[in-house]
Amino acid sequence: MLEADNVWFTLLTMNTNPIHFDAEYAAGTEWKKPLVDSTFTLALVTGLSVQDVSEHGVNLGWKEVRLPAPVFAGDTIRAETEVLAKRESQSRPGFGIVTVRTRGLNQRDEVVIEFERSIMLEL
C-alpha cells in the first residue's frame, strides 16, 4: 500500500482527520506516523476477496468490523475468507445467501481488519 493511495482515498472521501495525511501531526501520536484510513482498509480487503467469494454476487452488508492493528503506508495486505453459513433466499427464488468472515493480514501476519459480510448469489 502506497502513501499516495492513502492520501488520495482520504481526500476523495473527504476525511479531514490529519492522522491520515499530516506526517507532522501523526508524529505526535502513539503511532508516530500516519495511519491508513480504516475505510480504505475495509475497501481494499473486501476487494481482495471478491474474485474468490463474491465476484458474481451482491454484497448485502458488513457487520462486526474490527480493526485490531493499524495499517501504515508500505504495508502489504492479504485477505483470507471463511464461509460461516449458507442458505436459500426466502424472498428471491433461485438465489442463496452466504455469510463469510474475512480477515486482512499484514506482512507480519497480524490481523489488521476482520469483518463478516453477507452476499446474495444466484444458485
Question: Locations of the language-model features?
Answer:
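HotDog/MaoC-like acyl-thioester-processing domains
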Residues: 71-76, 80-123
